[in-house]
Amino acid sequence: LSVFAKRYNFAALKNQKSNTVKIICSDMDLKTFSEQEAKKVTLDYFSGDELATQVWINKYALKDSAGNLYEKSPEDMHRRMAREIARIEAKYPNPMSEDELFELFDKFKYIVPQGGPMTGIGNSFQVSSLSNCFVVGVEGSSDSYGAIIKIDEEQVQLMKRRGGVGHDLSSIRPEGSPVNNSALTSTGIVPFMERYSNSTREVAQGGRRGALMLSISIKHPDAEKFIDAKLEQNKITAANISVKIDDEFMRCVESGKPYTQQYPIDSPNPTFSVKIDAKKLWNKIIHNAWASAEPGVLFWDTIIRESVPDCYADLGYKTVSTNPCGEIPLCPYDSCRLLAVNLYSYVENPFTAMANFNFELFRKHVRYAQRIMDDIIDLEIEKIDRILEKISSDPESEVVKRTEYELWQKIKDKCINGRRTGVGITAEGDMVAAMGLRYASDEAIDFAENVQKVLAVEAYRSSVIMAKERGAFAVFDAKREEKNPFVMRLREADPQMYEDMKKYGRRNIACLTVAPTGTTSIMTQTTSGIEPVFLCVYTRKRKVNPNDKNVTIDEVDAQGDSWEKFTVFHHKFVDWMVVNGYDVTKRYNEKELAELIKKSPYYGATSNDVDWLNKVRLQGRIQKWVDHSISVTVNLPETATEELVDRLYREAWKVGCKGVTIYRAGSRGNVLEDVSKSKKSEKESAQTAHTAKEQICFPVTDMLKRPKVLDCEILRFQNQKEKWIAFVGLKDNKPYEIFTGLADDEDGILLPKWLEKGKIIKEVFDDGSKRYDFQFINRHGYKTTIEGLSYKFNKEFWNYAKLLSGVLRYGMPIDQVIKLVNGLQFDSDTINTWKAGVERALRKYLEGVVEGMKCPNCGESSVEASDGCYKCTSCGYSKCG
């Protein structure tokens, strides 16, 4: 118990009289805070930024399993991290103090541990890792069913502890290969892609996360099937996919020569080989990326050639795949923790003619950042020990627990022996704007490369200093690294640092990355990673927790989730306004905002405005000074052509990028329809189009005749404080009529909250009058009828409902009905609220029609492709994988 208490900072007080032990947590104040208390303090901390406040409370504030809050603001979190890292620092020479560390973390100003470290450091409530990402893979061949299942189990075990996972499928036999079992031939890659994807979806429940990267070599005979696998609807929905492309393939694409695929891919004597048209397969990659943003491309020869860990490939550090976002190529059972340096904070006198980058302070802080990352490795080893202890104490048999235990033991060994870190950056876009430069201009690229070069040299210098003070990573050998291109650039940049590295070694096998900083950048209130600003002004909405108090609910969707909306100015754009004397309290109209943006350094530099080829060149220039990789996305307009995507991908290879991802606006919403059409003959396509038209625009004679009884779905929503209800009558499972009104009106309809379906019955009386009744089956199995829907709702609402029901019956497509509703102009706020509710109710029936990529969290078409991942600008949701 004393060992346990020491490791996890608990005090164990034994009562000799009662023979009991009282456990006291000494590393944190056990006082709990209400969410309202935390929100009030945190909102002040973030200067009124609602989104940053909610992101921090929901994702990073210290909580126990019951949801009790133990931190009231990020200041408490930063104290927690500083205290724990200072404890590790005290073990080594020249330690940093808790106060020094806190100053680096406070206000997210300089150094920001990301994700796992932020939630896990000093957190004794969770038995989880600090690592953000992992790669798994068995030793030797992994094409047996046993190996495939083992990787599946390892993937799930990591995801249940909040880790993102990547693994490579290149060792699985291609489809049709002979196997020694009852199947006789291999099923190939795709069924196992589905298996791994389904496992990810399964584990991503109840607050757990599941993020997966699947990769394959272009040399594999099933590469084309892999590339097409995600085009089938509802298949492989929980994985990112990337193709590992070698230089030989690219040269064949350029020259038009055939390319040889084989299995096994690295064997001098393959059991199967085939020559393919490289250009044709390349065009398929381009088309799919243009149509659906996948697959991503990994330039594998560049990755391996530049990889410092691969100098030790024969010692277990051979890179096989990447994490889900693609910024950390890893060997099996290695892991990485992430940290970002906030570049904007080093610009003195930002947005003025006197703007200056403080390189002296930057160098000092980068050395601290690398040191902190090494300390976090020690904390991670403690966390893994706790995981291993937890597994050992679990009641299951040793046979059941063996895979998980051995998995974490292998991860621990790699962690101890390689000590890999992921020091990165954020706020590149704001930094160059603050310096008066336009993002991705030649001057901005030169400046950004110089900053990254300084960061690389200082991070490696810090690792060398730590090797002298703490010892080098276990297998360091300067001779192995002397011809590595990245190390050679370091030697040229700082010969003395290189000589010191040869003499003392290096503490960490690899140090640098540029990772996604989705929620991190929300809290730093800056641009993300090396991305440009998304927009200077936009609308966000956040999901309201049912337990939230004193919030404004602007809408409730069909699923019953509540949302709060607010207009957001990009924080550093506001800083520019203040510096240049513009009134930040004024309510600007669209024209005024456009003029304002035009005067700023952000003009022409948003994610949709930048020169795309220059952005790729920027990535290539920065990549020269990053030993791992960079997660970044090139955002393209919907009108972008496949030829442009082709140019971007080729340019990325030529300028030294290790990977490239594009996102064309609207591509996610219509890819399935496009692909299905491309695979049919013109006659079949015409037939399909005719059938689709019949399905959307119903035959008039059939639709006009209303049955007496229609199935009905009930949708509830809320705008401001008003509760609304919609009854959607269905004919052939398609909307035929819709009635809406206030649910909490004095004469409104009160229904059980669990009720979602029923029937609408039309009664026609002898005098010609009509009445609509609603009927449902209660929980006791009895029919319950509510008579006179038309009398329950406001007459004006009822008349508009009759109008909409009419156009639905005549077969107007749902998307056009929504446009019709949206185009109606009303003076009354109540009627406009009704309009918004009807629009949301009808959107449920738009499956397969709506264009654009929607946020899986809030449902809005406001997803920004950024850092190789996706971030919703409405609710703050971000996802890689």
Label each region the model flagged.
Residues 868-878:
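Cysteine-rich micro-motifs
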Residues 856-860, 874:
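Short, cysteine/histidine-rich loop/knuckle motifs that typically chelate Zn2+
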Residues 498-500, 676-730:
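Short, Gly/Pro- and small/polar-rich lid/capping loops
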Residues 101-102, 262-266, 365-412, 416, ...:
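Internal maturation/activation junctions in enzymes
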Residues 84-89, 104-181, 189-192, 203-206, ...:
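Function-dense linear segments that define catalytic or interfacial modules
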Residues 861-863, 879:
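Cys/His-rich microdomains that often coordinate metals
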Residues 10-99, 181-195, 205-317, 348-352, ...:
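Conserved, charged catalytic cores of large soluble enzymes
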Residues 50, 55, 326-328, 380-381, ...:
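Catalytic alpha/beta core of large soluble enzyme barrels
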